Regions:
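Residue(s) in the substrate-gating loop at a strand-loop-helix junction
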Residues: 30
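Short beta-strand/turn micro-motifs at beta-sheet edges
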Residues: 38-40, 75-76, 106, 144-150
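Short aromatic-enriched loop/helix-cap "lid" or pocket-rim segments at secondary-structure transitions
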Residues: 37-40, 96-100, 130-131, 171-174
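Catalytic helix-loop patch of NAD(P)-dependent Rossmann-fold dehydrogenases
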Residues: 2-14, 18-24, 33-91, 97-98
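Short, well-ordered alpha-helices that flank and scaffold nucleotide-derived cofactor binding pockets
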Residues: 14-18, 67, 71, 108, ...
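Amphipathic alpha-helical segments in well-structured domains
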Residues: 5, 9, 99-104, 137, ...
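C-terminal substrate-binding subdomain of Rossmann-fold SDR/epimerase-dehydratase oxidoreductases
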Residues: 90, 110-221
Length: 221
């Protein structure tokens, strides 16, 4: 985890430094990069980075590394590359069959007639279809590449991309919604599965900056 998220970020940025043809860089980390204080409101881009588990800590480290490079090497207001980081919520979408993903895990478990293991059924997450943050990444990258930096400074900034704060759902609610489309399968949840893993309960993102600077908002339910 640390090697991928920290050293991977560092290696990529070093490659950008060595390539004069790069015009813009949009780095994607995670909403888990924030120090989670179990707030009921959404985290803003200026809130503390950190993490109480290795994954979250590694994402916070990736953000710190990225912004140190932005300020040290990519801060020229005239010359490219122009850079930014993005922090997206929990994405759902086709093509993701990895382990420890809520939709693929449900599909595999129910197809086998087994209850799906849920680590934190009452935890809330900023769920969104993968096309939502992708649209934000592409729009941000296009504006950086074209030098569209007015009226807000987009360069060397961080942006949250997530759903509206009032549509955050619990893991259990997502599983129950999926079960409605799987008649005949075992929709029981094994709520003791992997209970020893450290996970935060409340997680929301404030995406006001993306709305103000990029005119971006989530549009899908």
């Amino acid at each position: 985890t640390f090697e991928s998220n920290m050293m991977g970020t560092l290696n990529m940025l070093e490659a950008v430094r060595a390539c004069p043809d790069v015009g813009a860089v949009v780095m994607i980390t995670s909403d888990k990069c924030y120090r989670n204080d179990e707030w009921v409101w959404g985290y803003r881009e200026t809130d503390h980075l950190g993490g109480y588990d290795p994954y979250s800590a590694s994402k916070g480290c990736a953000e710190i590394i990225a912004h140190s490079y932005f300020k040290s090497f990519f801060g020229d207001p005239v010359n490219a590359p122009y850079c930014a980081t993005t922090r997206a919520g929990n994405v759902i979408g086709g093509g993701d069959w990895a382990a420890d993903r809520i939709v693929p895990d449900c599909a595999r478990s129910w197809a086998a007639g087994q209850p799906v293991q849920i680590r934190s059924p009452w935890a809330t997450r900023p769920w969104q279809l993968v096309l939502e943050p992708l649209s934000g990444y592409l729009w941000l990258g296009a504006r950086l590449l074209l030098g569209l930096n007015e009226p807000f400074n987009l360069r060397s900034q961080a942006y949250n991309f997530g759903p509206a704060a009032d549509v955050n759902n619990t893991v259990a609610e997502v599983v129950e919604a999926l079960a409605m489309h799987w008649p005949g399968f075992n929709s029981e949840m094994d709520k003791a599965g992997q209970a020893g893993m450290k996970e935060c309960t409340l997680l929301k993102l404030c995406c006001d900056k993306a709305l103000a600077c990029l005119n971006w908002r989530a549009t899908l339910d």
